[in-house]
From Swiss-Prot:
Protein keywords: Glycosyltransferase, Transferase
PANTHER family documented for this protein: GLYCOSYLTRANSFERASE, UDP-N-ACETYLGLUCOSAMINE--N-ACETYLMURAMYL-(PENTAPEPTIDE) PYROPHOSPHORYL-UNDECAPRENOL N-ACETYLGLUCOSAMINE TRANSFERASE 1
A GO molecular-function annotation: hexosyltransferase activity
Gene3D superfamilies, per database record: Glycogen Phosphorylase B
SUPFAM superfamilies given in the database record: UDP-Glycosyltransferase/glycogen phosphorylase
Root EC class: transferase
Organism of origin: Methanopyrus kandleri (strain AV19 / DSM 6324 / JCM 9639 / NBRC 100938)
Record bears the keyword Glycosyltransferase: yes
EC number: 2.4.-.-
Name of the protein described by the UniProt record: Uncharacterized glycosyltransferase MK0977
Family membership: Belongs to the glycosyltransferase 28 family.
Length: 344
């Protein structure tokens, strides 16, 4: 969505295709833009693992769904005369671009799955093939030695995190606190872990940890969850349009290991407590980066408990997040310039 906003800012009119919650978010953010639906393909289970047998049971018509996705994107490209395709790892969009003969750009921070075994080799082979179908690979991060970049002929460009909005577009902290009814002098702990089964478990355990912590430290929890938890503890919201606002006014953010939220925290220099999903390779790599870059505390899933969360919050609450190169919230702007450059 941040890239879509920046493309509009420079006078381009993006056309979107997506499925599920992603499509709904795009329709809310861009009510006057074309947003097309795609066949839904769930590659990963709720705990973040990739299970080929589960995938085939869930989608016995997987080849047909993939073909339908290619055809849907091909029709959209032709209908609107799209000159470039930008995909966040949607393989069928790249195939559609190849068929029609327009440039393709992939945006991904997952370059290679760590580990051994035939399944890991299969996934890495698919990722490599996807990158080779593209003309440019944009990585929404800054380079460090936690990244294992595969040798591919495709141009790779590091652009920094792509945020929904630029940090300088956010309201002042006192205005955000007034908007949400957060006390001016409160020490804010934001809890947001997505809607998966394990994400909901993180939220519930975090709430119990906050109750333990409240016996020694005065904190104001802000909990983003569709489930009612906490028994009136702090502020609970089912959904927010602009999570960046709440990250800006928070002293600590408890979240899973998702790249987007961790990047938002890094750009706003808000310390995190990261709890990766048990079998999610990308999130475990992201948690490793949290430690290496000094962004906060990582709690391994096997250590997840109210006591461990309370300790992690106490450890992170006065954390000084360093300023990191390209972690400035302008990745969408850089990416938009590259996309526009393919049209010259």
């Amino acid at each position: 969505m941040g890239l879509g906003r920046e493309l509009r800012r420079i006078g381009l009119e993006p056309v979107f295709s997506s499925f599920g919650e992603g499509r709904e978010m795009l329709m809310r953010e861009f009510p006057d833009a074309p947003v097309y639906g795609l066949p839904k393909i769930e590659l990963f289970s709720e705990d973040g693992s990739f299970d080929l047998l589960l995938l085939l049971r869930r989608h016995p018509d997987l080849p047909l769904r993939f073909y339908a996705g290619v055809e849907a994107d091909r029709r959209v490209i032709r209908r609107h005369g799209c000159k470039v395709v930008v995909s966040d790892c949607q393989f069928h969009a790249l195939v559609a671009a190849q068929i029609i003969g327009v440039p393709a750009i992939v945006i991904s921070n997952m370059l290679r799955v760590p580990g051994e075994g035939s399944l890991v080799r299969l996934i890495n082979g698919m990722l490599r093939r996807m990158f080779e179908l593209a003309d440019i690979v944009l990585i929404p991060d800054t380079y460090d030695d936690t990244y294992d970049v595969p040798e591919i002929d495709t141009e790779v460009v590091w652009v920094g995190p792509i945020l929904k909005r630029r940090p300088d577009e956010l309201p002042p902290r006192d205005a955000v606190r007034r908007k949400y009814g957060i006390p001016d002098d409160a020490t804010v702990v934001l809890v947001t872990a997505g809607g998966s089964k394990y994400g909901r478990r993180i939220v519930r355990i975090a709430v119990e940890g906050l109750k333990l912590l409240s016996k020694s430290i005065d904190v104001f929890p802000v909990i983003i969850s569709e489930e009612r938890v906490g028994d009136g503890l702090g502020l609970q919201l089912r959904y927010v349009d602009n999570l960046l606002e709440l990250i800006k006014v928070s002293n600590v953010v408890i979240t899973h290991g998702g790249h987007t939220t961790l990047s938002e925290c890094a750009c706003l220099r808000t310390p995190v407590v990261s709890v990766p999903l048990p079998n999610h390779p990308e999130q475990h790599m992201n948690a490793e980066r949290v430690l290496q870059r000094g962004l906060g505390v990582a709690v391994p899933p096997e250590e997840l408990s109210p006591k461990r969360i309370a300790e992690a919050i106490e450890q992170a609450i006065d954390w000084k997040v360093p300023k990191i190169r390209m972690m400035d919230g302008r990745g969408a702007e850089r990416a938009a310039r590259i996309v526009a450059g393919t049209l010259d």
